[in-house]
Amino acid sequence: MKKLKLHGFNNLTKSLSFCIYDICYAKTAEERDGYIAYIDELYNANRLTEILSETCSIIGANILNIARQDYEPQGASVTILVSEEPIDPKLIDQTEHPGPLPETVVAHLDKSHICVHTYPESHPEGGLCTFRADIEVSTCGVISPLKALNYLIHQLESDIVTIDYRVRGFTRDVNGMKHFIDHEINSIQNFMSEDMKSLYDMVDVNVYQENIFHTKMLLKEFDLKHYMFHTKPEDLTETERQEITAALWKEMREIYYGRNISAV
């Protein structure tokens, strides 16, 4: 898309929001409590602050203030106030390609924010535990939140991801013509690296005329040992392994499709 010469500030709002899920099986009540404590510590307010501070760097935002909070019995959120750095619009990369990978939180850039909240969860029966992180990156001006997508998915090591991207409002060029989007996009998937896309089954539901884009991701490879907490698959009977695998896979599909699935 040809770069626009605008009249005044770019008034478009670009919002990227997604849910990231991590699934685990904990055999006993003690193991379930241990998993919740482990995941709560792994994604505490300090670590989330580090992740979102790097996110601000990736999208080109300048941090003004940070507020963070860990909750009892579990969960965390962080808030970062930021401003848009003095960037030459000619240097902003608006092309449709993946952002960088790494080697809650709210941020405010002029009229923009980044936020993340965590939700560890388990049920006393069945042994299934889930961890959900809700993240939203909303920006005004030339900054694109899509550049942080690759980094955030990689950092949070997700089994399931649901992503929404929307462009709202309009901006005017020097001739007074309204523009309701200032960059090309056919799919959120085009902002992910090839190695990232190879790991997931993905489906898009897009409403192009409304500048609304939606992508769902489900991890392709399933290895039971990666989903067990303090229990080795080889210590279980074949029947137990099959039952746990079926329960985990059902849980993941229900979250991915957003509906309860009857047992076969």
UniProtKB/Swiss-Prot annotation:
Pfam families documented for this protein: AdoMet_dc
Annotated GO biological process: spermidine biosynthetic process
Keyword Membrane recorded: no
Keyword set includes Flavoprotein: no
Subunit structure: Heterooctamer of four alpha and four beta chains arranged as a tetramer of alpha/beta heterodimers.
Family stated for the protein in its record: Belongs to the prokaryotic AdoMetDC family. Type 2 subfamily.
Name by which UniProt lists this protein: S-adenosylmethionine decarboxylase proenzyme
